[in-house]
Amino acid sequence: MELSEIRKNIDKVDTKLFELFEERMKLAECVARTKTSTGDCIYKPDREQQVISKFSEPADEDMKGYYEALIKRVMLISREYQYRILNEDTPADTEAAMLSADTVTVRFTYKGFPDNIVTAINDSGAKITGFTMNNSEYSISIRHDSCKTGIINLLKMIESESDNYSILVPEISVSDIPK
């Protein structure tokens, strides 16, 4: 087979991939809107692992690692898109809501998407009340009563153990937390 013919075939496959990707992103938008309306969180590590496991088992052993890398990247892009939609659906007074008396706002920068922080917050049982992002700067609002779970200390620990994060955590004391 000639190189030009191989390239034409690759172009056909790429066209199909683009169409499927667009379809997947439209479905991801539906997922984001559904999760937003039910108050569910976007990032579900168990679901992502289920998808990876489900489809990597029958894969050609030589391709398994490549497939896993591809699907992880697609899910990351999907998550970023869903968070953007969540951010668009947030009322215009997001900043005011994030600074309200019943929330603590954690601001941080990160190159890439902050799965560690989102997972840590979700795993702690803390309630995220707002999420905004602008390039690599993120703001997450957490209910004050979530601070009782030690989430602020957990976030500070993540920052101290990683060069990827710069976290601005407000200093709060127990007396600042509503009873």
Predicted regions and their residues:
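Domain-level signature for soluble enzymes in the chorismate/prephenate branch of the shikimate pathway
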Residues: 1-179
